[in-house]
From Swiss-Prot:
Family statement drawn from the similarity comment of this UniProt entry: Belongs to the SVAP1 family.
InterPro entries with a match to the protein in the record: PH-like_dom_sf, T_SNARE_dom
Protein name: Synaptosomal-associated protein 47
Gene: Snap47
Compartment(s): Endomembrane system; Cytoplasm, Perinuclear region
GO biological process: exocytic insertion of neurotransmitter receptor to postsynaptic membrane; exocytosis; long-term synaptic potentiation; synaptic vesicle fusion to presynaptic active zone membrane; synaptic vesicle priming; vesicle-mediated transport in synapse
GO cellular component, one term: endomembrane system
PANTHER family referenced in this protein's UniProt entry, alphabetically: SYNAPTOSOMAL ASSOCIATED PROTEIN (PTHR19305), SYNAPTOSOMAL-ASSOCIATED PROTEIN 47 (PTHR19305:SF1)
GO molecular function: SNAP receptor activity; syntaxin binding
Length: 419
């Protein structure tokens, strides 16, 4: 995700120590920096990398006006006041992204200039693919559980229809018929059914948790935002506060729409008739990991707004690029350009020479990549098997529904004759 993506912008004032005055402008937060620009000039006056910030505090200027102070490395202190909608809202969001950046890069403070090796970048790419595959597999298995539940419901319905058939037969039998009671004692003959054996699916985790991320939560208005957590379950969504107290649970079928305002901000709404809607707005540094999962679970209810279209543009690729994206990514990580080609003569010798000149992966990185690829292969095979099982289950459900519909129509005609 690009570090230039704007997370949020707030009107505020910045204290310029050289001129001893407050300058009105806008405070802009990106995933990796904090910037202040003056209103009139519209130029960035102050730019602070989040990794260089050592402390963020709530203070007051002249003992009256609320402000936020940012302490930078080298003991430089920056004052921001007149924050809207409120100081607490701005503080919670900035502190959230600052903490998440520090937690995600534990070695940055110790050695900020050390670049990632090609092997580390490639492992990060493969690990991200593995997480996406695991999340998709969880959602797919939950879908399989729902199909199993539908199949069990249809089997129970057919059993009830068999009982209704015996009752109707009893009612249709003349009162003088001496063997009318035998219908209650004669075992029902097994009917040939094209049912599909359905293997039970084990739930993932105690509550089927797909992903849980820290977030800044606000309900209805931004002025009441506070730290919390967003939990994506296979059956819905849960929002907790910082004390792990449940604020609201959205069942999967109760969610009416999800709007993605930016790669880091989403809003979730449940509509009601005759009372206010339930709506929550969430901002999180980990939201780019959550949005693809929401797109899978709520594909017909999610909407990407203008500032979030960068997610869709990143996901688009030409067919040629999509077919060999891993190879192109590996080539890029190896430092090769897409236009470099080896001549036909002596190709094997030049390849061996390139391997000697460019040490790509260490032995440990190669072993870890092998393990990740093995896991990806296993996940892909499991996903394929689950999809085939669900296709067969859908065929069985279709047959069972058609059979139940015909039986219900037949019973309705028999009941009308009795009336």
């Amino acid at each position: 995700m690009s570090s230039d993506v704007r997370v949020h912008t707030w009107p505020c004032s910045y204290y310029l120590d050289l001129e001893k005055q407050w300058l009105p402008g806008k405070l802009t937060l990106t995933p990796r920096s904090l910037k202040f620009s003056v209103d009139k000039a519209e130029e960035v006056l102050v730019g602070l990398p989040l990794s260089s910030i050592t402390e963020i505090r709530k203070e007051t200027s002249l003992f009256i006006f609320s402000a936020i102070t940012v302490l930078e490395k080298g003991q430089a202190k920056h004052w921001f006041s007149s924050l809207r909608p409120s100081r607490n809202v701005v503080f919670n969001i900035i502190e959230h992204f600052w903490r998440e950046l520090l937690l995600s890069q534990p070695g940055t403070a110790a050695n900020p200039t050390s670049p990632m090796t090609r092997g580390q970048e490639l492992m990060g790419l493969m690990a991200s693919s593995q997480r996406r595959m695991e999340d998709t597999a969880k959602v797919l298995h939950h879908q399989g559980e729902q199909l199993d539940s539908v199949m069990r419901g249809l089997e129970k319905m057919e059993s009830d229809l068999d009982v209704a058939d015996r009752l109707l037969t009893e009612l249709e039998t003349p009162s003088w018929w001496p063997f009318s009671a035998k219908f209650w004692k004669t075992p029902v003959e097994a009917k040939p059914r094209d049912s599909v054996s359905v293997a039970p699916c084990e739930p993932f985790g105690k509550e089927g948790v797909v992903i849980r991320v820290p977030a800044v939560v606000s309900q209805r208005t931004e002025s009441h935002s506070k730290p919390g957590k967003l939990t994506v379950l296979v059956s819905g969504l849960e929002i907790h506060d910082s004390s792990s107290l449940l604020l609201h649970r959205f069942e999967k079928e109760d969610v009416d729409d999800i709007k993605v305002h930016s790669p880091y901000e989403v809003s979730i709404r449940q509509r009601f008739i005759g009372k206010p809607d339930v709506a929550y707005r969430l901002i999180s540094a980990k939201m780019p990991e959550v949005i693809p999962i929401l797109e899978v679970q709520f594909s017909k209810k999610i909407e990407l707004l203008e500032d979030a279209l960068v997610l869709r543009s990143r996901g688009r690729a030409s067919p040629a690029e999509g077919g060999c994206s891993i190879r192109h990514a590996a080539s890029r990580l190896m430092g090769c350009t897409t236009h470099q080609e080896l001549p036909t003569g002596g190709q094997e010798g030049q390849q061996s020479q390139l391997q000697k000149d460019w040490p790509l992966l260490s032995e440990g990185e190669a072993q870890e990549l092998t393990q990740i690829l093995s896991k990806l292969k296993g996940l892909a095979l499991d996903t394929e098997a689950e999809l085939e099982r669900q296709d067969a289950a859908l065929d069985g459900i279709t047959v069972a529904v058609d059979r139940a519909t015909l039986t219900v129509d037949k019973h309705n005609r028999r009941m009308r004759k009795l009336l």
